[in-house]
């Protein structure tokens, strides 16, 4: 009998041992840390032009030793960084995820407001009350949090609040962004940790002030900059990040200086070290926003020494960031992805200076003319309630009161808008929302960029070379190209250098990350994993 039980015990032990070996051999391999690098204003052309000036461990390490998605295009219309980032992180488009731009026209109060504004939240260190409530789908960061509840740690360090919230999604442990009035890290009560202790310490111990007050001068002799080849009298520049943007403004130029990037790297590394990101087999994620914008920027191209210097200094910051991550976590255990926003190579100003048709579309005067036209047709009333982001909002209440045919009024506005300089097309919203067929067409991109909750009644598009500007002459979106490409790189972990020439869309990024991390795709994802460099079945 003893021999019988002994045999059973040995048999069970044997199969348990074999099962354990099999489980170990089939265990899913994941990167321990995912680092997302979003660079506002990044252009592939700039990376190529400045390649010879970069250090080997910064941009070059990512671009030369990583995976280059050569033909990655945006399948949405450019309407601001919020929409671009939300599309990257959700693998979906505004038609589903709801983030149609940095701002939108709120029909309830007839105001243009930030896409992240939320009066139900509280600001921490700021009067700004923001949340991700208008982001209607989950992100890849959210799915990571849900896949490993209370284990996966996720943080965001950003320059701007809109970018911070879109990178953080709904479930980031903490996000922080720069307050460029009071010069400190701030956040929103929407995220469970509030202002993380590392950011708070930088505010209190003077670490933020030290970095944010660095005088910005050229990194090298001014004659060595590309801009000097076009201007032999080019003078060295000097900026103080605490100086005001304009005479009557309380806002500083901090966010458009290298100091902003230094602050992001410093806090990001503090979080990685003190929160022990990447220390175990449960993947963690940190998203970082940088910029290559300069004070008072008018051009998208490399026409200034300041623009070059932003790139050169950011290159050194990225080199330091990667070196520290390699020391603390190991780049072989870290997946890095780097991307920019939609932006044209040349601004309308540059195109115009070279006799290429281009211009800026300003809504204020245009909407006044549209209203005058409708008054001539239907009577002396306020027929237009608002406009933003190529969306025209009609006074539905007044149209109903006058018992007018709504579609007839819509069509009248469409017909009139076609006479405006810079306008390519004008369509009733119901027509745009019903567009089907070729997903690569211009109208499909327009449909992708509209959400029923925030859409106007008439939607216009602009001619090539034209950009919309708001009442302060700030661009609403930065690209009007029919097909908009953006640099995108993956680096680190198990990836080998590769150039992927297969056409992909930006909605394919989130499912690719999900596949690498072996987690569910975001719940509104319409993209597909990029198979060229993902090894999972």
Q: How should these model regions be labeled?
A:
Residues 43-49, 72-74, 126-132, 251-258, ...:
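Second-shell loop/turn segments in exported
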Residues 54, 80, 102-129, 137, ...:
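Secreted, luminal/periplasmic, and some membrane-associated catalytic domains
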Residues 364-405, 475-517, 531-536:
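Substrate-binding rim/cap in mid-to-C-terminal beta-strand-loop elements of soluble/periplasmic
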Residues 46, 254-280, 293-334, 513:
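A long, amphipathic alpha-helix that forms part
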Residues 92-93, 101-282, 291-298, 421-425:
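His/Asp/Glu-rich, glycine-adjacent segments
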Residues 24-67:
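Active-site-proximal N-terminal segment of extracellular/periplasmic enzymes that hydrolyze or transfer
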Residues 69-89, 156-164, 289-291, 335, ...:
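Short, solvent-exposed turn/loop segments enriched in Gly/Ser/Thr/Pro and often Arg
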């Amino acid at each position: 009998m003893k021999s019988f039980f002994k045999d059973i015990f040995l048999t069970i032990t044997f199969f348990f041992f074999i099962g354990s070996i099999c489980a170990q051999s089939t265990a899913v391999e994941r990167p321990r840390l995912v680092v997302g690098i979003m660079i506002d204003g990044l252009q592939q052309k700039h990376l190529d032009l400045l390649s010879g000036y970069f250090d080997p461990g910064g941009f070059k390490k990512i671009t030369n030793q990583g995976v280059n998605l050569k033909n990655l295009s945006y399948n949405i219309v450019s309407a601001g960084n919020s929409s671009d980032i939300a599309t990257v992180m959700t693998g979906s488009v505004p038609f589903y995820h709801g983030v149609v731009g940095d701002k939108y026209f709120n029909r309830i109060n007839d105001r243009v407001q930030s896409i992240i504004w939320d009066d139900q939240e509280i600001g921490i260190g700021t009067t700004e009350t923001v949340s991700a409530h208008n982001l209607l789908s989950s992100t890849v960061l959210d799915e990571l949090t849900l896949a490993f509840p209370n284990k996966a740690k996720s943080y965001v360090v950003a320059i701007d609040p809109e970018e911070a919230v879109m990178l953080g999604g709904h479930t980031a442990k903490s996000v922080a962004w720069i307050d460029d009035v009071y010069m400190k890290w701030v956040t929103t009560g929407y995220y469970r940790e509030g202002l993380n202790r590392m950011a708070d310490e930088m505010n209190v111990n003077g670490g933020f002030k030290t970095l944010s007050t660095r005088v910005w001068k050229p990194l090298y002799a001014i004659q060595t900059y590309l801009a000097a080849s076009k201007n032999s009298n080019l003078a060295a520049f000097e900026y103080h990040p605490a100086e005001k943007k304009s005479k009557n403004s309380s806002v500083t130029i901090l966010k458009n200086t290298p100091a902003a990037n230094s602050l992001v790297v410093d806090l990001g590394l503090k979080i990685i070290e003190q929160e022990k990101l990447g220390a175990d087999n449960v993947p963690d994620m940190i998203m970082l926003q940088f910029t290559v914008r300069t004070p008072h920027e008018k051009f998208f191209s490399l026409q200034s020494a300041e623009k070059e210097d932003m790139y050169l200094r950011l290159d050194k910051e990225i080199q330091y960031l990667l070196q520290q991550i390699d020391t603390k976590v190991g780049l072989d255990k870290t997946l890095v992805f780097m991307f920019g926003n939609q932006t044209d190579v040349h601004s309308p100003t540059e195109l115009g200076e070279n006799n290429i048709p281009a211009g800026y579309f300003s809504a204020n005067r245009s909407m006044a003319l549209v209203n005058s036209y409708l008054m001539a047709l239907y009577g002396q009333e306020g027929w237009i309630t608002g406009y933003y982001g190529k969306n025209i909002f009609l006074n539905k209440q007044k149209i109903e009161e006058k018992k007018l045919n709504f579609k007839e009024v819509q069509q009248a506005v469409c017909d009139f808008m076609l006479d405006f300089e810079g306008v390519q097309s004008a369509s009733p919203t119901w027509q745009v929302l019903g567009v089907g067929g070729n997903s690569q067409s211009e109208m499909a991109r327009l449909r992708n960029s509209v959400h029923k909750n925030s859409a106007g009644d008439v939607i216009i598009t602009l001619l090539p070379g034209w950009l919309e500007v708001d009442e302060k002459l700030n661009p609403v979106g930065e690209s009007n190209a029919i097909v908009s490409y953006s640099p995108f790189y993956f680096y680190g972990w198990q990836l080998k250098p590769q150039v992927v020439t297969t056409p992909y869309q930006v909605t394919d990024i989130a499912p690719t990350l999900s596949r690498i991390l072996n987690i569910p795709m975001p719940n509104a994802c319409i993209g597909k994993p990029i198979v060229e460099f993902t090894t999972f079945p």
